[in-house]
């Protein structure tokens, strides 16, 4: 069973609430932890020790010059999902930092986008039992058409 930290305790405490209310509460709370996430109006759809799913709508403030989600917004949701799944697993005394981000833009996006970040049981165990380390966090970013307009690789580190 995963070790609980403050972030995972918040998720567990709200897990019995109706999904719409839970999503809203997570988004507001996490937007206070990382203000840029709140400003971008990112919504947390699923949060667990093994997976975080976030969504960003194609709204005016996040659009590029052709009316699609800006490249930075695409990278932001990948970084947000991978960062929060990492944060669900590291001890409270650790700092979580992104070490590198690689984003390949494959085609224009269509509509809202969803990022799904996942960790293996081995990655979770490593994060929960070591004071410092790093790992590549898997993430898939999809648009409304069901396609992946970007491919991302996020390397996260934690240290005490």
Which positions does each model-derived feature cover?
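Non-catalytic linker/capping segments at the edges of enzyme domains
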Residues: 1-53
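Soluble, non-transmembrane catalytic domains of enzymes that act on hydrophobic metabolites at membranes
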Residues: 39-46, 51-57, 69, 138, ...
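Hydrophobic residues positioned within well-ordered beta-strands of beta-sheet architectures
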Residues: 54, 99-101, 115, 135-137, ...
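Hot-dog-fold acyl-thioester-processing enzymes
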Residues: 57-82
